């Protein structure tokens, strides 16, 4: 109770014992050695010579952090989108209402006798304005796994399903569905014949295979727990480990989805200069101990950096603050490759947002945004320092990417503003880096 932390700005902190008056001073970014070769109370043993203790612990360096420092605890969350068939479930049906109302289900499960259960079912039938048999039928559907009926997918498979859902044109969509999309790919490809484009702009148009307007989407974000600094084990929200559920939040919004041309991408990602630039980054990523939903490949670096450039341009064109935007990168090689980007907004209000972001996905407007984003990739106000940087940011995991050109507010990025490099987007002939959008 007598130990006090006295802060005199970030530069000086004092840890003082009120009982004996002993104090230690340290800076916020200072690293200190353990023990500094002095005998500690718990090592008073003839079997542990002082010199061995000092030699062993002096090699270790520690950084003193206050207990509420944001670097001490790292939240672990998983976010998924609601896609068909779940997104197409009609709202207001008996089974849908029971599915969304865990309290009513708990009342039924908590009945101690069959007679009490029957009474609760009749009461719910009156509240739902249906008959008791409808409640029983809905409960049977829920027991079979409604609405997914036992389908169990990994995070990678969920991303793949989301990617396919954006490419699929859904017939007879209703405005109350949780995923409402309008494919603009045909109109995008027709830009070359309907609008006077130069050769460079034609290449940009052909580099995007799919463009989808997302009028409505629903995201579910689940808090899985947190990790402590230096630890890998996830501490669950219920620290005692007795809970069989996780806290989650439902978010609603709109967005823009685009997918790059796969044939051109396969040629670009094999270019020697592109592969060489990635190989310079991979050892740092391995040493960082970080984990990402996607393998770090050349196509991932292109997609992730392009996503940031687009978010910054959307902030300028559409008036959306970058902190309100969220990215989702769909990236995979192999037999079912993915190369897509979703930029969306998400708010707790079930009404969603006002539609301004979805409007930017109209082909002519989005082409203007994409062209300007690519133009901004070629220069930075901190060049040549930024473009020639060998490594910057957390873990030195960024190359040509800084706050003046490619970084966005932390909530907008899936990967903590790391793994960014404008070199993968812009044309850099001097270093043998071809531009994806400059290829034919």
Question: How does the language model describe each region?
Answer:
Residues 1-440:
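Extended, well-ordered protein cores
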């Amino acid at each position: 109770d007598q130990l006090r932390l006295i802060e005199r700005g970030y530069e000086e902190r004092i840890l003082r014992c009120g009982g004996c008056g002993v104090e230690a001073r340290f800076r916020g970014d200072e690293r200190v050695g353990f023990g500094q070769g002095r005998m500690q109370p718990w090592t008073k043993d003839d079997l542990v010579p002082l010199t061995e203790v000092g030699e062993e612990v002096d090699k270790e360096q520690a950084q003193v952090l206050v207990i509420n420092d944001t670097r001490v605890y790292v939240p672990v969350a998983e976010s998924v989108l609601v896609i068909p068939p779940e997104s197409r479930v009609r709202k207001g049906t008996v089974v849908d209402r029971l599915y969304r109302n865990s309290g009513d289900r708990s009342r039924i499960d908590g009945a101690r006798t069959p007679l009490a259960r029957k009474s609760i079912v009749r009461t719910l039938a009156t509240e739902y304005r249906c008959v008791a048999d409808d409640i029983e039928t809905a409960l049977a559907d829920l027991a079979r796994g409604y609405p997914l009926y036992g389908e169990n997918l990994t995070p990678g498979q969920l991303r793949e399903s989301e990617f396919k859902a954006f490419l699929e044109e859904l017939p007879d969509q209703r405005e109350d569905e949780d995923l409402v999309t309008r494919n603009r790919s045909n109109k995008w490809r027709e830009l070359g014949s309907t609008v006077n484009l130069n050769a460079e702009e034609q290449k940009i148009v052909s580099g995007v295979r799919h463009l989808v307007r997302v009028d409505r989407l629903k995201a579910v974000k689940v808090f899985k727990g947190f990790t402590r600094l230096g630890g890998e084990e996830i501490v669950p929200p219920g620290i005692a480990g007795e809970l069989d559920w996780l806290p989650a939040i439902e978010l609603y919004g709109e967005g823009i989805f685009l997918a790059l041309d796969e044939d051109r991408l396969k040629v670009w990602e094999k270019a020697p200069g592109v592969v060489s630039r990635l190989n310079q980054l991979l050892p740092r990523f391995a040493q960082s101990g970080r984990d990402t939903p996607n393998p770090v490949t050349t196509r991932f670096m292109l997609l992730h950096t392009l996503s940031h450039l687009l978010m910054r341009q959307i902030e300028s064109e559409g008036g959306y603050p970058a902190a309100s935007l969220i990215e989702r990168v769909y990236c995979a090689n192999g037999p079912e490759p993915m190369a897509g980007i979703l930029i969306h907004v998400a708010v707790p209000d079930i009404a969603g947002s006002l539609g301004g972001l979805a409007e930017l996905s109209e082909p002519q407007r989005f082409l203007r945004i994409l062209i300007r984003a690519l133009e901004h990739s070629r220069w930075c106000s901190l060049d040549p320092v930024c473009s020639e940087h060998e490594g910057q940011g957390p873990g030195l995991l960024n190359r040509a990417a800084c706050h003046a050109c490619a970084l966005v507010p932390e909530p907008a990025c899936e990967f903590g503003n790391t793994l960014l490099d404008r070199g993968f987007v812009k044309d850099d002939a001097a270093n043998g880096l071809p531009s994806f959008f400059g290829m034919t």
